Amino acid sequence: MEKIDGKDQSSQGDEEKEPPKSYPYSVETPYGFHLDLDFLKYVDDIEKGHTIKRIPIHRRAKQAKFSTLPRNFSLPNSGDRTYAVPPQQNWSPVVPRKISLGTQEPSQPLPLGDLPQASVQGSELNYHRKALLAKDARQAEAGSLEDVGSGRPQLLRASSMPATLLQNQVPEEPSLTSGPSTLLALPLLQDEGSVCDGAFDPAEGLMGFQASAQSVDRELGELEPAIPEQVWEGAEPEEGDLKASSHLSQPGPSSAVQSVPMDLEEVEIEHHMREAELVLTPGSATPSPPPLPSPILENDLSLDEIELSISEIPPPPPIEVDVRSIGIRVTEESLGLLETDTSSISSLKNQVLALEDKLSGRTEELARVRAALEQQEEETKAREQRIQELECTVAHLEEKLSQERASEAPDRTDATVNTDPLQELTPRESHDKNIGVNLLNTPDPECRAPRAEKNGFPWVQNNHKQSYPSPEEPVLPPQLSLPRGPEQILASSLCSCLSMELRIEEEGSEQEGGQEEGAGGLSRAAGESSWSTRESAPVIREEATSELPGAERPGRPASSPQDATIGQYVKKIQELLHEQWNCLEHGYPELASAIKQPASKLSSIQNQLLSSLNLLLSAYSAQAPEPEPKETPAPPPSTPPPPPPPPPEISPSTSLKSIMKKKDYGFRAGGNGTKKNLQFVGVNGGYETTSSEETSGEDSSPEDLSDSETEKKQDCSESREDRDLHPSCEAGQGVPEGTRNSGHTSDRGEEVSHLRAERYKPSEEFLNACQTLSQHLPETGDTTKQLLRQSLNTISQEWFRVSSRKLSSPEAVAAYLLEVQPHSPYLLKLLVNLADRSGNTALHYSVSHSNFAIVKLLLDTGVCNVDHQNKAGYTAVMITPLASAETKEDMAVVWKLLREGNVNIQATQGGQTALMLGVSHDREDMVQALLSCQADVNLQDNDGSSALMLACHQGNADLVRLLLAHPACNSSLTDKAGRTALSLVLNSPAHVEIAELLRAHSEPGRSLGPKELQKN
């Protein structure tokens, strides 16, 4: 129990610094504080006696509410008040009114940290209670987090109570002067509801308090306010306490009269104060604690003594919660889902069936794919087995050939090829072409015609049959054949289906019976005949004309053209091996590089196989003797000329290659001295280089030839027309001069030379086109007319066919130049400088194929444009370092070409020069020739590399020494990456010699001469 004195009210009121913002009786200080001056007004009213009349009306009409008390609010000075302390009036220990702070409803306990509240009894202590509550509300809002851990509600501190109150005593009630101070506190307590509204939120448990407060209004006449039981604690006040006002001694007139109205007003104001405390804020989301219990009415207690009982309520006991498990049973029938489930199950079954169908379909597709893969694997295995069989066949043929050469008995076989169409069997429409194959050099008058049937085709065996010449016909040399009679012609026509079958299979891929190199790059004389074949079965089929049963041709041995078919299959094997090698290089470059190593066993096997094939092909192609024209019967005048042999095949280039510097070359200690030859592709101006020390079969690759597919077909038609115009040349084609028998007479040799001249003569179509161009081109200067374009196209096709092939004949080129020269000098210049779709001229092709005899003929005309660039930007001079000049005559042509052309022209593809190309391909002789012809050693390509950098990059010390000997060589040039020639070789220990050469050259005041470079 603590007693509170009213003297400390002024000090407690000074702690509130916030002035009422809308209070009419206040003064603002210079520091922004407001001083409340209402107490002066109340003092005047008390002195004038207007307290009872004006207080309820004035305060009830204003209805002003404040959220907080003014900061500078203070009670009237204690000196202005007089307290009458009636002696011997104390609270009875039996009837103390204990008002609990922070009481709560039993069903809704107050959470930890809520504001503790206390009630003070008496009209003078109501203001002090409100001030403390407002202050504690602000402190609780600021420190709500700090109060969460406390286990009991926060109570009023003893330090917040007035210091002048004595324990176990009640402050004395003022007699007269305490009335104004009590009236001063009542209007402020009406606004206490606003403080509660801002601090607390509505709760469901507080609705009973509002109902109780409303019942107070109905019972004001009886002076018995209805207070809920949840708020009050302790016993009800006794009846004697309600009459405590009679014990007050109040000086002044009519004190007894004023006591009752004051009590009524105070009771009414207390009711409004409690009603304001019970007002709930509807907009808040959090429940507010129950309101503070209203203080005991003044007429219930004595006005002389008011006792404040502060009790501490322990926290409510924890609520026991019973947990029960409730099971709810829901059936499908009650929910009405039975039909829906049935339909959903059926739909799911349908989906499962559809998925099973898809799965089965995919399984079938997978099975088909697997079967296709297995079939492809089987086909691949079959191809590999076929290749192995072909290799075995080649080995068997080589062994057989060696045995035949080693045999002492001479053996000679004549093979005949019938060129008649299959449907024409009359003797007039038949023509025999005889090719004698001399397998041994020793002639023998005996001719044996072995024949056997195997797999439906004639198969040549080692058994021989003796045949005797007819007495009516003279005996001719063994390699020649006699004319046949009608019976033999008919027999050969009947058997010509065999040869026609081969031609049907190889239509479009046969080659002209002219000069063509073998797979090993072996050059043969002009007129040599060869064939190209398609892929065939491992069993070699040989075709020849056969005789009717019982019909004999005396003196005429017959056999299949063994050399032709074997040569075809040998070439096909070479092509397959070359294709296999290309696939290996593209698909497995690491394996291909390993095979290329000289120490590799696979490399040696590959080289041996290719060399064996080359020897076999050259042996068969070199043994085809040329039959004399006079021995071949001329067809009757009415007989149409026989169809010419097909022109040589021009395989389209499989890939476009360029003579740009190598991207994948590595460092080497020095040049390998290998002669490299440029193979011209001729479609987009690209080139490829081959080495004579690499696989010898590369020279006969499909990329060796220069014309495109369109030109190939046109050349075939032109060659057939040319052969039709010169049927007498058929017998002399395709046979080298060196294979003729030494026993031939001189007049026979003259006829052969005459036939050669006739062979190289341009066609009539070519001559007519030249005449047309010579008449119109000088006048018009263009080729817009259809006739002129056709003529130019004809000339272009035949000219490139004659001059631009790898095995073109210089005699043929000379014959064409001689035929064109008389027409017009302009036409000669047009013909020599004629370019194809890729911008390549005959000079480009001739240099790329190392046909320096044709190059010399073109240069001797005096109208050849040496500096003509193709679409890739290369001139004939630029590709000269890639050609192979093996003789002094060839080197003389090279020097002439370099002197007439510009050696410093750069290609448009990469900016390379002829010197860079020579260095990139390790052509030391060509580099020396270019330097002698004023080639600029310091030119740089598009990457900034010079010839010296390329030589250092390849590690060729000889070329580096040769370039540094040039007085204009600059070794400090840098490429676009900022590298010099020295920096390129410093990282490799194998180039110490080159690094020393570069350092010696870069020293100031020292220049290495050729002799010093030779010593180093």
From Swiss-Prot:
Gene3D superfamilies: Ankyrin repeat-containing domain (1.25.40.20)
Coiled-coil ranges per UniProt: 346-409
Keywords: ANK repeat, Coiled coil, Cytoplasm, Phosphoprotein, Repeat
Listed Pfam families: Ank_2 (PF12796), KN_motif (PF12075)
PANTHER family given in the database record: KN MOTIF AND ANKYRIN REPEAT DOMAIN-CONTAINING, KN MOTIF AND ANKYRIN REPEAT DOMAIN-CONTAINING PROTEIN 4
Acidic residues compositional bias, start-end: 695-708
Stretches with biased composition (Pro residues): 632-650
Main location: cytoplasm
Role, per record: May be involved in the control of cytoskeleton formation by regulating actin polymerization.
Gene of this entry: Kank4
Protein name stated in the entry: KN motif and ankyrin repeat domain-containing protein 4
Bias-annotated ranges (Basic and acidic residues): 401-414, 445-454, 709-727, 745-755
Protein transport found in the keyword field: no
Record SUPFAM superfamilies: Ankyrin repeat (SSF48403)
